[in-house]
């Protein structure tokens, strides 16, 4: 986190000076505000998956997983729409409308916004694998999203797109992490009862309702 924050600040200082550093700070604060929904949701459903896996209720897990994916996909589109439609309001929470910092942050936030389409899947996937006692996969997704792919974007995109590349580094990291998350979910779905065919055996009985 400290490394990527330093890079964000150093790159923005080089391109836009102190106003740029303030603007990227505002955008990152706004990001945290909007993705808090995914964090709260993922932490809330994680114990449900843990309990049902321990009980061997893989039919429930599969059904809940479907509900969660639908919620994440719909809310991702909704949050993106809100971020674009109310970008001025969101940025205005942290800066004075009409100021140079506000103008830079507003332009950057609109370029940054596509990250919200993918962040929900990544946060949910990481929490899900933790709940299912697969800490290694959870850590890989989290590391890729918050450091690995983000560092790659910060090192490459500004060279190609200048300051626009800074705003697009997070959307790129979220997109690549989303592809990684989907790959892990597909690869491990049979292990956790999310795929078709026979369900894993884990000491409980299937059936029942939530």
Identify the role of each PLM range.
Residues 29-30, 143-152:
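Small-residue-enriched core segments of transmembrane alpha-helices in multipass membrane transport
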Residues 19-20, 135-137, 162-163:
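Membrane-helix interface segments
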Residues 6-11, 33, 124-128, 151-156, ...:
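Alpha-helical transmembrane segments of multipass membrane proteins
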Residues 2-33, 51, 89-98, 159-160:
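Helix-terminus/linker motif at the lipid-water interface of multi-pass membrane proteins
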Residues 21, 31-34, 102-110, 145:
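Alpha-helical membrane-interface segments at transmembrane helix boundaries
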Residues 1-2, 39, 119-120, 146-150:
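Transmembrane alpha-helical core positions of polytopic small-molecule transporters
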Residues 49-115, 156-210:
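Short alpha-helical transmembrane segments in multi-pass integral membrane proteins
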Residues 9, 23-81, 85-87, 119-141:
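Small-residue-rich hydrophobic transmembrane alpha-helices
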